[in-house]
Amino acid sequence: MRILVVEDDRLLNNTLCYNLNTAGYTVDSALTKSVASSFLTKQDYDLIVLDVNLPDGNGFDFCREIKERRPDTVIIFLTANDMESDMLKGYELGAED
């Protein structure tokens, strides 16, 4: 399984990637939407772990873009926000969690 982690907090990004690699997954890491976009032009991913707030874009908008090109890609949002409206918006955009 190939996973893309898109999280701008470097420590959290590194921790997620380390744990996923240790569990046997192939993982690519992006700190920004633009870097993640470049990965997506070269590689298909089984799972994308996506931050809602990125320095160069909105995770919800990016999710919409990804789902338009690759509707079968599983997306899990990662955020410190605990607002139910954010959770519902993610589900409406096709995120799994």
Indicate where each model-derived feature is located.
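N-terminal/domain-start alpha-helical segments
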Residues: 1-97
